[in-house]
C-alpha cells in the first residue's frame, strides 16, 4: 500500500476487516455536478438536453401578434465574473457572470399574402440576459458577500399515484402529478361513484373528463365494461355464454343447467376450469335467467329503431319491462347489456354515468369550465382552449421525462412514446382502469414514502425552474414590444428586457426557503449542509402537516439516506443527510452502489441501483463472510429483499453491499464504535460534531474511523497539490511547487498556492490555513500541502484527546456536568479565535450628511487614542467594551439660539452642538484585537486618507506578490535551462564561437534575458530551450495582466446602497478560552456543561503521578446506552500507551532498525490490516515515530471496528491492565480512591454554545412601545422576566416592598422609574410609585368594550 505525503508522517492503524472495494465518492458532487449540468457552459463539447440550453430552446421562437417578426434562439455564452470569490466576499458583491444570448430576429414582408411568409431581413446579435450566480469550487454561492448553500429537495416524483383514505370504506384515489402544470385527481366515494378534481377544486364526475376528451357514452362503457347478449323468447330470458374462459374465477349468480334441466354448476359457486369443460361438453351456449336479474342490468349501446331512426334507449339506461316491450314491438329479440352477471367487476363507471348530467363533449367542456372559472360566462372557443391548455399543451403542462417514465411503468404500457410529456387519452383511461382494479382488489396502492416515488431536486434544477419563470415573463414582454416598437431597423436588443430573469434568480437566492446561509462552524458542518436533503420548501411538505409516516425511516433509505442524522425538534425526519456512497441519477432518484454476484461469486463490478430496481433483488450484507475466491462461506445468509430482512440460500443472492458504512452519512461515519451506541444518542453525536468550534491548535482524534481524511479533503478547506513536484518555497502565505513535468500533464513549470489567513467564517469562527510541507519535499498530485481550519495533517480534527476518568468528584459532575483540569486552559487546548465584523455606515440624512471623523463633541482624548486621523481604529489596537471603533457624527435638528449664544458660537467657532455622536462602539461583554479594516466609499466626494492608504497597501502587496511569483518562475526556468544546456555545443551566442561548449561560468556572466538568446546545435535541446523561453515570456505577460486586473479591481469604485456615503468594516479577533458554563461533548451524544476548572494539583492522578484531564459522571452511561464512549476510552488509553512505548524507545535509541521492531509490534501484531513499513525509508520512520509520541492514531470503521480481544491485546502492548481500569489517588489528600476507576483517552469537542455569548446583564435599556416594559433577550439588551411564579414566590415570603419595586419602577411605571433615577442621582434612597403602564393598557382594552374604567387616586383618609 502506498502512502501519501501526510499519511507517511502519521500512519493510522486500521482495524477494519472488510476489503476496500470502492472509494467514498466526492462528497460535494450532488451540488457541483447538478450546477455544472445546468450551466453546460462548454458549448464546444455539445450541450446536453438539460439546463439553460433546453429552457431557451423551449421558450423560443417568439412570434409577434401580427406575424411580422419572429425571434429565434441561436446560442448562449457565459462571460467572466467581475470579481473573484474573495473580492466578492470583501465587497459584499454577488459572485456571478453575465449571460449573453445570441438571438436572431427574422422580419417578414408585411405586404405578403396571409398564408405565405416572405423573409425580408434577418438580424442577429448577442443580447444580455442578466447575471447568473456562479458556484464556487466548494459547491457554494456568494450572494451579497455571504456564502450560501442551496439545499437539495426531496419531493414527490411526477407520475401517477394510487392511495387509500383509511377513514372511509373503499375510498381509493389516483393522482396524476406533472412536473409542471395542473394536478388531476380521481377518487371513489363510499357509493362507488368515481369523481374527478382538477387542482383540488370542486369535484365532478370522472366521466365528464372522458366525454371532454371526445368519448361518447357508448365508447366509455365499451372501454370499461364487458357486454353480454340477452335473448328474449316465449320461456323468458336467456343469457348467451360467449366466452366462458373469461368467466373463470367469477361467482355465478344463477344455476347453469343442460337441456334436460340437470344442474351442471350451482348458483353462488366460483367457476373453475373443470366447470368450464363440463359446460362445453354439455353443449350449453345460453342459460335461462329470471326477470329480477334482468332488471338489474343496463343497456350497453344505444337501441335504435332502424325503420324510423328513433332512439328507444340510450347506453347505460336501465333494462325495464317497458323497454323490453318496446324492443319486442320493433322485432328486437336480442339486447346487448353491460355484464354485471358473469363478472365481479364493479359497476362504477355505469353508476358514475348515471350521476353525470352531461350528454356530449360540448356540455362536458362547459361543465369543466364552470368548475375552474366559476362566474365566468362560458364561450365556445375559450371553453375548449381552457381544457386543452390544462393537460395537452407542452408549454403549460409537462410530465417531464421522469413523469412519463413513471406513468408508463405504473400503468404497465408503452403505448405512449417516452418523448411525449403531455397527457394522452390512453393515460387517463389507463389511470381510471387501474383505479377500478385496485378497488376490485386486483391491484395495490402505492407507498408514497418509498424512495422510488420521491426524487431529489438539486440546485441546478431549481435555478433552471426560476430561469424558466423569468424567461416566461421576458417572453410576454417581447411580444408586447414587437407590437409597440416602431423602428426602421429593429434589433433583438430593442425588444428584450432581461430584468424579470435577474429578479427571479435574485429572489430565489436571497429569499428562497432552500437557499440558506451556510453553516460554517467547521468543515464537517459545511460538508453536511451541502449534502442535506430537505422535504420542506416550495412544492414540498410543511412541517405542521407532515405526519409520522413521512418522517420515519423507510426500508428504501438503506444506502441512500442516513437513518441517523436528522435534526431534533419539529424538523425531525423531514431534513435528512445523504448516505456516504449515495448518488443522484439522471432522473433525480437516489441510487446506492452494490457489488454484483454472478453464479454465487462476488465480483468487484459495481452497479448503482435505485429504490425501484432494488425491490426486485436479493442483497447480502457487506459483512457476509467470503472465501479466498470470493464465494460465500455459509449456505444461509442474512439478506434484504423487497424491504424485508430475510435468511436465504447463498445461490439466490444477486448483489452485495459495498461497504459497512454505506448506510450512514459522513457525520455518522466519523463516530467510532457507532454500532455500540443507542440510535438517539448517535443522532445527537452526529449533530453535535457539526457545532464543534475549531480550536487554536487542531489535534487529530486518537480513535477515529478513517473517514476523517475524506471529509477534510472534500471540504475544500485543505490545500491539495494539483500536480506532482518538489516544494520550492514555503511561508505562511504561499506554497510554491516546482512541477515535475514528466509526471504531470501540464505545461506549467510552477504551481503557486495562496493560503487563507485569519478569515471570518459565517459563524464568526476563524478560517486559517497552515502549510505542512517543507522546502525540498517531494509531493504527488492529490497530496495535502496545507491544513485548513479544524484539520491536522489532512485529517478532520474537531476537538482534543483528553484523559478521562469515569468517577464522581464532589458533585461537580452531577447531571452531566464536566470537571476540567486547569492544564487544559493553560495549554490553550480549547482556546478558539472568533472574528466579529462590526459595520459603520455613514448616510445622507434629511438634515445633512453623516460624517466619519475624529472630531467628535464631548468625547475625551483617551477615548480617541486608538483612532487614526480619519476617525477609524488602528489595526492591532486592543479594544474593550465601549471603545470607539469608528467615530461618526450625525446632524441634529437646528435649535433656535439667542443672539448672545450665536455671538459666542461665532467667537469660539463652535459648530458642534448641532451634531450627535453616533459612533460605532464595541458592544458590552466583548474585547479583542482589531485585525482588519475595510473602507468603502462613493467616488463623488473623493477618497479619504484611510481609504487611499488601504488601497495603496493592497496594490503594493499585490505588486510584491506578483513580483515574487515571477521571481519564482524565473528561478525555476533558470535552473531547468541550466541543467539542460551546460556542456552543450553552441550554434550562436554573443561572445562565443559557433561549436564552443557552454560552461556554468560563462552563463554566470550573462543576465538571464541574454540566456534566452543563445541557440544550440542539438535540435532537441533547442526545442526544449525554446519551450522554456516561450513559457517564460507567456508567464511574464500573464503576471502583468493579472496585476493590472487586480489593481483595477482594488481601485474600482464601490457600488453602495442608495443614500450611503461610506461604509467601514472593522474585524476584531476575540480569543475565547474554555470556562465554566461552556458546553462540551464527546462523539457519542455525551454532552455536558463545564462546572468547574480545577487546579491540576487537585485532580485525581495515576500511580505514576499523571493527573487526569476530565472527570465524567459514570451514571450518564447506563441509561443513555452509549457504550461506544467506554470502548473509545479503552482504545484511546491503549493508543496513548503505544505512543509512550515509542517515546521510551526513542529515548533509548534513534536507530531505525530498533524503531521498526517496535512499530512492527504495534501495527502488525493485532488486527487483520497490516502496514507495509518497508515502504518507508529510515528518515521517514524517524519522522513517523516523532509524530506518534502523543499516541498512535487508530481507525475503527463503523460496523467493522475493533473487537474486544483487539482492544485487550493493544492495552497489554501499551502496558495497561486489560480491563482498562486503574488505581487513582485524590489530588487533595493523596489517598487512593476505594475502587479502581475506568480511565481512558476520549475525543472531546467544545461546542458553539459558549457562556460568553449567553451571559448578559441590563441596568437600563429599551422599552416596549405598548406595555412600556423592558424588552427581553440579549439581542435587544433586554431584562430578565419576572413572571407569574416568581411573583407567587415573593408573595409567599410576604416581601411586599420588593414585589412592589419589581412590578412598578423596575418594570413599567414610567413616572416612577424616572423619579427613581433622579433620586439615585441626588443620593436619596426613596421610592415613589405611580400607576404602572400595564394598568393603562388594560383600561384602554376595557374601554374598547364600551366600559369606562378609571383609577381612583383618592386615599382612604379622604
Curated annotation (Swiss-Prot):
GO terms for cellular component: DNA-directed RNA polymerase complex. The keyword Glycoprotein does not apply. It catalyses: RNA(n) + a ribonucleoside 5'-triphosphate = RNA(n+1) + diphosphate. It is an enzyme of class 2 (transferase). Keywords: DNA-directed RNA polymerase, Nucleotidyltransferase, Transcription, Transferase. The keyword Transcription applies. GO terms for biological process: DNA-templated transcription. It holds the Pfam family RNA_pol_Rpb2_2. Its EC number is 2.7.7.6. InterPro entries: DNA-dir_RNA_pol_bsu_external_1, DNA-dir_RNA_pol_su2, DNA-dir_RNAP_su2_dom, DNA-dir_RNAP_su2_hyb_sf, RNA_pol_bsu_bac, RNA_pol_bsu_CS, RNA_pol_bsu_protrusion, RNA_pol_Rpb2_2. It comes from the Bacteria. GO terms for molecular function: DNA binding; DNA-directed RNA polymerase activity; ribonucleoside binding. Belongs to the RNA polymerase beta chain family. This is DNA-directed RNA polymerase subunit beta. The gene is rpoB.
